[in-house]
Swiss-Prot record:
The complex is composed of two ATP-binding proteins, two transmembrane proteins (HVO_B0370) and a solute-binding protein (HVO_B0369). Predicted to be exported by the Tat system. The position of the signal peptide cleavage has not been experimentally proven. This is Putative ABC transporter molybdenum-binding protein HVO_B0369. It comes from Haloferax volcanii (strain ATCC 29605 / DSM 3757 / JCM 8879 / NBRC 14742 / NCIMB 2012 / VKM B-1768 / DS2). Belongs to the bacterial solute-binding protein 1 family. WtpA subfamily.
Length: 305
């Protein structure tokens, strides 16, 4: 494969070797502890689906606190809060633009980045074709390869997939690429997409690098001009957009994760500070990027943040 068009193969082992870490397993929510007989205050976090595993298996809640994590697509999370369906202490999203609309929060902090990749299943015939194709667009256009993606109306991964394809159409001078690739029967909720992938029902899928690393999926790296990871390409990313069902238009940009705190309890403050302040410790082993400059605060930030 051409290194630019196929962008090379990677896996969890290769990524962890590069960052020098090993991610722990487990499925239970993280909890701090108090002395015997005392009950730790619980802090609720409503989060992007791509943060769920890291928050529940890697994040160390501060001593004296417990966390409860509920995760969905970020666009759905934003609507749930905006419609008063949920009232969490902390909201953590995969796109800070959603804090401006449909939400309207006074402040938030960005704390991590990610990249789009194409994960593939080497155990299926279609997945094998992905590794053998001349380029990743050619691989995904193969009728024998079943492609999965998430719903752009429900989460940023879905609309970022559309962004990446639009950017790829320009990058490779293949203007029909997006129209040729996208079909409604490819769309799954995020958890169902991963289940289909694990069961062999989908040969390849657009996912965040963190999702592939966490689950040990082999994947193709995409060029920086396409994968929405590089601030140097921000102006090019911003040329693509998608309009959500509520009329909000989101534009392409480097993938950023952001969080806001909605309550002022000591426990919520402590958990929030740990979440944005130690993101590198619990997110980098899972394939996220946490730059040394993080966290960045925006808006009318309270003195206690």
């Amino acid at each position: 494969m051409n290194p630019d068009s196929a962008a090379g193969r990677s896996s969890r082992r290769a990524f962890l070797a590069a960052v020098g870490g090993v991610a722990a397993g487990g499925l239970t929510a993280t909890a701090g502890c108090l002395g015997r007989g005392e009950e730790a205050p619980t802090v609720s976090i409503l989060a992007a689906g791509s943060l769920q595993r890291a928050l529940t298996t890697e994040f160390d809640a501060p001593d004296g606190t417990r966390i409860e994590v509920e995760a969905h697509g970020s666009a759905r999370v934003a609507r749930m809060v905006d419609d008063d369906q949920r009232d969490p202490d902390i909201v953590a999203l995969a796109d800070p633009a959603l804090f401006d609309a449909p939400l309207s929060v006074p402040w938030y902090a960005t704390f991590a980045n990610n990249a789009l990749v194409v994960a593939y299943n080497p155990q299926t015939e279609g997945g094998t074709r992905v590794t053998e194709a001349a380029s990743w667009p050619d691989a995904l256009l193969d009728d024998a390869v079943s492609l999965g993606r998430t719903d752009p109306d429900l989460d940023p991964l879905g609309y970022r997939t559309r962004f990446a394809l639009a950017l790829a159409a320009d990058h490779y001078d293949r203007p029909a690429l997006t129209a040729d690739l996208l079909r409604r029967d490819q769309i799954y909720p995020e958890t169902q997409l991963l289940a289909q992938f694990d069961a062999g029902g989908v040969d390849a899928a657009f996912v965040y690098r963190s999702m592939a690393v966490e689950r040990d999926y082999p994947y193709l790296e995409l060029p920086a001009a396409i994968n929405l990871s590089d601030p140097d390409h921000a102006s090019a990313y911003a040329t693509v957009s998608y309009t959500l069902p509520d009329g909000v238009t989101v534009r392409g940009g480097p993938i950023r994760y952001a969080a806001t705190r909605r309550t002022d309890t000591a426990a919520a403050k402590s958990v929030f500070e740990a979440l944005v302040g130690t993101a590198g410790d619990f997110l980098e082993p899972s394939g996220f990027t946490v730059r040394a400059s993080h966290p960045h605060y925006f808006g009318d930030v309270p003195p206690t943040a």
